[in-house]
Amino acid sequence: MENVDTLILGGTVLCLDETMTRIEDGALAIAGDAIAAVGTEREFRQRFTSRNIVDGKHSLILPGLVNSHTHAAMTCFRGIADDMALMDWLGNYIFPAEARNVDPELVYWGSLLACAEMIKSGTTTFCDMYIFEEETARAAREAGMRCLLGEVLFDFPSPNVKTPQEGLAYTRKLLYRWSGDPLVRIAVEPHALYTCSRSLLLEAGNLATEYQVPLALHLLENSSEKKQLQEKLGQDALSCLRELGLLNERLIAFHCVCLDDEDIETFRDEGCKAVYNPESNMKLASGFAPVSRMLREGICVGLGTDGCASNNNLDLFQEMDTAAKLEKVRHLDPTLMPAETVVRMATCQGARVLGMDGITGCLKAGMKADFILIDLNRPHLTPMYNPYSHLVYTVNGSDVKTVFINGKMVMKDRQLLTFNEEECMQQVRRIAERVRESLKEPV
């Protein structure tokens, strides 16, 4: 018999592979950081031995979820400004609060708290854009989470850098510092067309090309932005991106609410990736992204929560439920966004958006061992006829029982194993006191 590091025995395994393999009374064998084999419990009891056996009975076992767009450290700003339009929210509340409060300490503890929230709701990989991203990388590494992240680039000063050139230099340092890390990858991340000059966008694109990494930005989040960009640029957003050489397979575009039919065809032809953020777009009344049309055209679309200041949580199960239902009611068509499609957006398609589809997002031999166990032995999850329906319309993040990332168990029976959750919450409560005091100052 072959010895492996960990055996998961029993339960329903959803592989989310090319054939959407489903195995009842399934099993996983883990060797080091990777999946050695996927099969049945009966087969594996005869084939493998392990000192670490996890009982998967009454569990749903699937790839860890991929949060394709968030701002992790903004857990520290959860609920400080709600019920207002995007530009008012950003310009009069979020940017001033960040200018007064964001420092390495806030970003580290806020990001670590986000990791706690994400792991406990089944997310194993996330894509982050924020300030002092070295601290987010450090927090993710401590938590044991997989991530793609980048320092947000602006034309104007941020709490971390004074000029666009400093921001690009900081990004270059991140690319060097985290090169080859097993969990942390770096992207180049200009904030948006309305906060970045053509020259900054061009240099960002050149840096992404030099290192062959993704370039991620917010794009056409609402109709006001679309109108503003037309006036500022004298052309539409995608024409500008095309002129700058940014429309290619490395582009990850967040939101994409105002893509028209021609834009969608361009995304398809150029291989650009998109991220759907329905709850944030609803809360800020930004509009409806044309997600069904993008999917029909074969565009790779992931699912993201956005940050805690505009959602206000990081639970991708809740996001899946909203994503499915919102598109149905928008078009008055219950067949749109079927559950299986939405689960793929939150797993294998999300991994593809981030350029990690050879690493995570599905369960098969050779892939990194990023997976979750959902406890089905609960009243609201009994009985189960269709596991994909369950995942989208019934499961809550709190139903996640056990989480593995890169072959390591990071949560067991709802208890985090890689860091002190209580200490993290205490630190964020302390930071929140100075944030609260700063909000009393006039803008």
UniProtKB/Swiss-Prot annotation:
Class of this enzyme: hydrolase
Signal peptide: none
Cofactor: Zn(2+)
Enzyme Commission number: 3.5.4.28, 3.5.4.31
Intrachain disulfide bonds: none
Binding site for substrate: E98, H191, E221, D306
Catalyzed reactions per annotation: S-adenosyl-L-homocysteine + H2O + H(+) = S-inosyl-L-homocysteine + NH4(+); S-methyl-5'-thioadenosine + H2O + H(+) = S-methyl-5'-thioinosine + NH4(+)
A molecular function GO annotation: metal ion binding
The keyword Hydrolase is annotated on this UniProt entry: yes
Ligand binding (Zn(2+)): H69, H71, H218, D306
Coiled-coil residue windows: none
Cofactor note: Binds 1 zinc ion per subunit.
Keywords linked to the UniProt accession: Hydrolase, Metal-binding, Zinc
Family stated for the protein in its record: Belongs to the metallo-dependent hydrolases superfamily. MTA/SAH deaminase family.
Protein role: Catalyzes the deamination of 5-methylthioadenosine and S-adenosyl-L-homocysteine into 5-methylthioinosine and S-inosyl-L-homocysteine, respectively. Is also able to deaminate adenosine.
Protein name: 5-methylthioadenosine/S-adenosylhomocysteine deaminase 1
Gene giving rise to this polypeptide: mtaD1
